Amino acid sequence: MHSLDEPLDLKLSITKLRAAREKRERTLGVVRHHALHRELGLVDDSPAPGSPGSPPPGFLLNPKFPEKVDGRFSAAPLVDLSLSPPSGLDSPNGSSSLSPECQGNGDLPPLPTAVDFQPLRYLDGVPSSFQFFLPLGSGGALHLPASSFLPPPKDKCLSPELPLAKQLVCRWAKCNQLFELLQDLVDHVNDHHVKPEQDARYCCHWEGCARHGRGFNARYKMLIHIRTHTNEKPHRCPTCNKSFSRLENLKIHNRSHTGEKPYVCPYEGCNKRYSNSSDRFKHTRTHYVDKPYYCKMPGCHKRYTDPSSLRKHIKAHGHFVSHEQQELLQLRPPPKPPLPTPDSGSYVSGAQIIIPNPAALFGGPSLPGLPLPLPPGPLDLSALACGNGGGGGGGIGPGLPGSVLPLNLAKNPLLPSPFGAGGLGLPVVSLLGGSAGSKAEGEKGRGSVPARVLGLEDHKTPLERTERSRSRPSPDGLPLLPGTVLDLSTGNSAASSPEVLTPGWVVIPPGSVLLKPAVVN
């Protein structure tokens, strides 16, 4: 019986199975032992197999056979990968881990065959993983050198640093002198290029300078600016040894060690304190200006009260605007879109937009020439965004009347190319405009639309909506009242009620969708 201090290691559950297997393979132990020696090229004169507690001599370093050890294994310490070793190979004292019944019968454990010691196969192209394959049905523990689990040597990609000779080159215009020490470069720039005369305007002519020739009104400002090129940081923190190019930055940094925050917010009721005046100024703007920090990307109208929130937005959406782009936007600002009103023609007047019903996406009756399942892509509504805001529903596009606006189905990724409106069983103009109908039919069809994007028609009475639909011509006599659902799944264009409408395509009524221009990065 096992004691509580001794780990079980699955010995109680597999004792009987292991004993039966060892009895069956007992007679084949000697044959397997010699076959293993022939495979490894070793010579062994002993007819009896090795002791149960010792692994095969070919896989442990034997001082008698140093030249006969397989070259695939090194002199590193052995690693046992077996989770439940069937033999006593993993015993620390070399004794057998068999059950007391097997030890009393004198049964010997089966020796591992040559198949059990197959070499490891690593996956090519995966240097960071330690994937290996163990032979199935192995009878013994697999011993591997510890060096097998060391990753292959990686080429350390160091950050590209400029050579010292290139760093100590004066990049002033028409200079290019070399220096051995940084202080020599700093003295050279200060003495020969930074002129003490005020008439020189203290202009920086360093190669690649972001100021583009703009000068300074004081010599000390010019000297501080030159440190950004020479990388000179003469002011060092005595606590953490950080260096700074400006003395003011060192003073602000020292406050992080002392905890001093002398700058208090002047807003009444706000007692926030800051270690520098710049942070206090940014905070004060949040009290007097409504979200002063805004995104400068054209078309993005996000504003924030904190500059860190704006930086997170720019990083998340990639709305980086360079200095040159900001100057171009100031010279030629983008036109602002007109505000939509119920009486203006900024939205598409009288245009029917066809979208797939959710039931059509999951295997409804297919349209002629329409591949199913449909890819998750939006319809191409670029042709609908050409309204210029004309009154009376006119001027939607050049050469097109106000109530006739063809859908651009040729560029639609949902439809095969070439695919026109004829594949829907309708001519091009049959998708647009309204038709004469009764007020009751319009109200009945309105309830059959599954969803409304923007309720712009709520500003008008039902009588005005009906009169507006009657004023538009009806090509081919198609009853397209606001809210009418077209049964396009069968190929015809007859109006259907929700009870008899099969899962197909849905037509959004005019006036319920507002098309807004958007800038996509």
Curated annotation (Swiss-Prot):
Residues 84-100 have a biased composition (Low complexity). The record marks H287, Y288 as: Cleavage. GO terms for biological process: cell differentiation involved in kidney development; hematopoietic stem cell homeostasis; kidney development; negative regulation of DNA-templated transcription; negative regulation of smoothened signaling pathway; negative regulation of transcription by RNA polymerase II; nervous system development; positive regulation of DNA-templated transcription. Residues 148-171 are annotated as: Transcription repression. PROSITE patterns: ZINC_FINGER_C2H2_1 (PS00028), ZINC_FINGER_C2H2_2 (PS50157). Residues 41-63, 84-110, 436-501 are annotated as: Disordered. The keyword Metal-binding applies. A zinc finger (C2H2-type) spans 168-193, 202-229, 235-257, 263-287, 293-317. SMART domains: ZnF_C2H2. Residues 71-137 are annotated as: Transcription activation. Residues 487-496 have a biased composition (Polar residues). GO terms for molecular function: DNA binding; DNA-binding transcription activator activity, RNA polymerase II-specific; DNA-binding transcription factor activity; DNA-binding transcription repressor activity, RNA polymerase II-specific; RNA polymerase II transcription regulatory region sequence-specific DNA binding; transcription cis-regulatory region binding; zinc ion binding. C-terminus cleavage is induced by interaction with CTNND1 and enhances by Src tyrosine kinase. This is Zinc finger protein GLIS2.
